């Protein structure tokens, strides 16, 4: 709609950055409370979480750039402008998890308890990011559709380029001169719903917690499934495996995220089984 929350002279404070910052701080506090309730020392977590956030953001942006390379090859500096939106949450999870793993191997910090405790914060980040995408307008653009749920952007809405029908290359979206007036799938809202579902599920997994690592791998599993089913088919993303496309309904299969999600689902199932067996053998 309007990416700028507040304009103070030349300084523009954007919704995307404000919402993500709030999600990070709230997620951090939720993680601290969870670890304290489990009896873990908070000092090591507080030392590593800053770097986990930094490399989570780096991984998120890198993942987005690598899966939508056309535009960024021609405009490489745009890859640095994360306030314009465009973050891969698979990349964020990978970047953050690798940071925790590094400190686990290097300094002996706990791995699975930290990753488990961080899951509500990641879910909040998904919700915040998608609302920020909605305000940006140009992020996570939905496909044109004739379905009743199609949304037509109002004339006063700002912050988005046009979308041409039938495009599968995201770089073409940026080039299109037409204004986006829909009706389109409002995939920003679809993605926010995915984040809300994961937030409630992550809180349930943390309470259940049959073993450390359970909440984290359940999160990876269900994020991959829910994103692939509820959001990706309706987004105007390049089809890496063009198995199905319906321009009338606004559905396309399969995007890069959907392709990557399958091995992540299998890995999650394997790790849940492995960690569960390890816990059972210690009893």
Swiss-Prot record:
It comes from the Bacteria. A 1,2-diacyl-sn-glycero-3-phospho-(1'-sn-glycerol) binds at residue 130. Its EC number is 2.5.1.145. It is a multi-pass membrane protein. The chain crosses the membrane at residues 8-28, 48-68, 80-100, 108-128, 186-206, 210-230, 249-269. It is found in: Cell inner membrane. Pathway: Protein modification; lipoprotein biosynthesis (diacylglyceryl transfer). InterPro entries: Lgt. Keywords: Cell inner membrane, Cell membrane, Membrane, Transferase, Transmembrane, Transmembrane helix. Signal peptide: none annotated. The keyword Transmembrane helix applies. NCBIfam families: lgt, PRK00052.4-5. Belongs to the Lgt family. Catalyzes the transfer of the diacylglyceryl group from phosphatidylglycerol to the sulfhydryl group of the N-terminal cysteine of a prolipoprotein, the first step in the formation of mature lipoproteins. HAMAP family: Lgt (MF_01147). This is Phosphatidylglycerol--prolipoprotein diacylglyceryl transferase. It comes from Thermus thermophilus (strain ATCC BAA-163 / DSM 7039 / HB27).
């Amino acid at each position: 709609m309007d990416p700028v929350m507040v304009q103070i002279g030349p300084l523009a404070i954007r919704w995307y950055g404000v919402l993500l910052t709030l999600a990070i701080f709230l997620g951090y506090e939720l993680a601290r409370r969870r670890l304290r309730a489990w009896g873990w020392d908070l000092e090591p977590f507080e030392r590593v979480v800053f770097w986990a956030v930094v490399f989570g953001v780096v991984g998120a942006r890198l993942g987005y750039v690598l899966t939508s390379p056309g535009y960024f090859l021609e405009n490489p500096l745009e890859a640095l402008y994360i306030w314009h939106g465009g973050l891969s949450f698979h990349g964020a999870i990978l970047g953050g998890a690798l940071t925790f793993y590094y400190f686990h191997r290097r300094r002996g910090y706990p791995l699975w308890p930290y990753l488990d405790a961080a899951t509500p914060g990641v879910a909040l980040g998904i919700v915040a990011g998608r609302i920020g995408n909605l305000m940006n307008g140009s992020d996570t653009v939905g496909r044109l559709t004739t379905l009743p749920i199609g949304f037509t952007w109002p004339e006063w809405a700002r912050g988005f380029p046009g979308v041409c029908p039938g495009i599968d290359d995201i770089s073409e979206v940026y080039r299109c001169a037409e204004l986006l007036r829909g009706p389109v799938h409002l995939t920003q809202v679809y993605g926010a719903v995915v984040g809300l579902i994961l937030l409630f599920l992550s809180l349930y997994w943390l309470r259940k917690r049959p073993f450390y690592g359970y909440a984290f791998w359940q999160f990876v599993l269900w994020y991959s499934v829910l994103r692939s089913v509820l959001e990706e088919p309706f987004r105007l993303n390049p089809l890496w495996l063009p198995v199905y496309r319906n321009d009338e309904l606004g559905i396309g299969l399969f995007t890069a995220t959907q392709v990557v999600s399958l091995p992540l689902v299998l890995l999650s199932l394997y790790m849940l089984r492995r960690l569960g067996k390890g816990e059972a053998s210690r009893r």
